[in-house]
Amino acid sequence: MNPIVKYKKLDARAVVPQYATPGAAAADLCAVLDTPLTLAPMQRALVPTGLAIELPGPACVALVYARSGLSIKHGLCMANGVGVIGSDYRGELRVPMVNLSNEPYTIQPGERVAQLCIAPVWQAAFTPADELTDTARGAGGFGSTGK
């Protein structure tokens, strides 16, 4: 299934999200900047993309992830871990970046800074319960299943 995601360029320099390879799970998002943006170590910035999108409906979510190369090579990550964009959002896609390295990193205008993944999503009906079904794991949390 290939859902149709409408986009609107809010800035003429915006780059339409593209999949880098035929098997790519996410499309690249590019920075729309007037000048290069240097992030000092531990500095955060909201990087504009110049794009707004319309998802096909409430059964769809857009997830924004860091690009693995920027994270591993330069320590540039999403400040919020993963961006979650609901189907009713119509504003600009902006990428909250943080530089976790010990060196400054400069984002260039037009640079690919994040990945946009479109996925199905359910809205759950939350129901109170006095008891929950027992499982082998039970209440075991962080690290409880071993290395």
Please provide the spans of the model-predicted regions.
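DUTPase catalytic domain/fold
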Residues: 1-147
